[in-house]
Amino acid sequence: MLRCSMADAPVTTRTFEHEGRQLVYDEYGAGPRTFVLIHGLLLSRRMHAPLATALADRGHRVVVPDLLGHGESERPRDMWRYSMPIFGEEVLGLLDHLELDEAVVGGTSLGANVSLETAVREPGRIRGLVIEMPVLDNALLGCALAFSPLLVWLTFGEPLARLVAAGARLAPRGLSHLADMGLDWISQDPGPSAAVLQGLFFGRVAPPRAERAAIEAPALVIGHPRDPIHPFSDSDMLVRELANGTLLEADSILELRMRPERLTGEIGDFLDQCWRPARRGAARTRRAAG
C-alpha cells in the first residue's frame, strides 16, 4: 500500500510485515534524522499527524506506525498477540524494515511505555526518547477505574458496541483533529480492541524500575497535572530514575493537541540535540531481521 498527500509536509503511507502480520506506517519528511512516534492506547497513527508535520518541517524524518490491533494495521482477536514487550518488538521490527541503525523513539501514554520497552531491549539503537504521559507505578488505580469498565463494555457489550461503531463510521470528519480522533476511537471493531486490553492487563505495564534506570539515552519526559491515568508523579519519578532525563511540564493533556507551539518547539529542540554530531559513541550494528 502506498498513498501520498501534499498537505503541508509530504506524507507517504506504507506497510511492512512483522511476525506474519501487516503493519501500517506513515512517513513525514525525509533525511537521516529519524523519529519514530507512537500513538496512544486504542488510537491510531493519525493522532500524531499535526506534530509529525511540524517536526518534518524542521528537517526531521518522522515515522508514525499503527501498532498491531490499532488503526489500519491488522487487528487479530487473540489476546496473546498483545503486550508491551511485543509492541516494543514491533518498533524494533520497523527499524529493521527501514534499515536504521538508530533512531529517536517516542510516544504518548501507551506509546511512551512502548518506547521504554524498545530502549531496554536494544539500547544501542536509541538515539533519544520522547516520553509523553508515561503510565507507571502511580497510575494503577486510575487505570483500573478507567479501563476495567471499558473492557467489560467491549467484551460483554460487543453487539451494542458494534452498532455504536457503525454509527460513528457514518459521521462526517473534518470538524477538528480532536473530533476526528474521537470518532476514529469509537468506530473501531470492539472485538480486537477488547483483545488489546486483555493482553495488556495480563502483561507488564512497563519495564521494571531496574531496567528503566539502566537506560542511558537522553530522554525528554512530558507530564501534566490533574490526570489520574497519567499522573505527573509518574513523569517526575521516571526522570529521577533515568540517567539523562529532562522533565517538561505541560499545562494539561490538551496543550500539545490544542496549543501545540510551545511543546512542539521543545520537542524539536530536543530532537536537534539528539542528532548533534559526535554526541554518542561509535556506530551501532543493526539487529538481524527475523
Where does each model-flagged region fall?
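Catalytic active-site module of serine/aspartate enzymes centered on a nucleophile-bearing elbow/loop
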Residues: 244-290
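Conserved alpha/beta-hydrolase "acid-adjacent" motif
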Residues: 228-234
